[in-house]
């Protein structure tokens, strides 16, 4: 099995095992290993693929899904200037603490600053807008994706895929996969998240769940702060 296929399957398997249900992919050449791996997972109904040709549109589409569900949504694109189109949505995700998992395909690092086609400085292109960044050049074992960092905002994984990009192995790499489905909470019901911990913070502000004023008032009458 070639390096790009191994790396893509390792990443996709972890994403599926984490309970991620949707991925938004913009077609391209360099991200072909990821696209094929996600397609294999979708054929087993392990994940749903949404295809958007324009990267800016794709990023905001994923942002909306992540915002509505509270679950991480990966966005996948090819190398080069395509990556820059993600920036507006990444900034929105950063300011709103939305779990957007940005995975950008890249050419090998040795082709940077050489004038190679579809190659630009993708490493740390989003600056401080992301909670975590990694420039991945090959599969490492054990390899663990930073899902904890997604709890506070977007994460960027820049993945270097050397040629060949096509899959050269038909092994059943999804066999025995164990999916950890996150506990579901109804974001529209008052008090839904209160059961997650014994102590917490009630956040009232811009678009924090869509509760009406009456719902907030009935959240729990025993809290004096809500009765003042």
Per-region residue spans from a language model:
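N-terminal alpha/beta PP-like core and its mobile active-site loop of ThDP/TPP-dependent enzymes
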Residues: 2-228
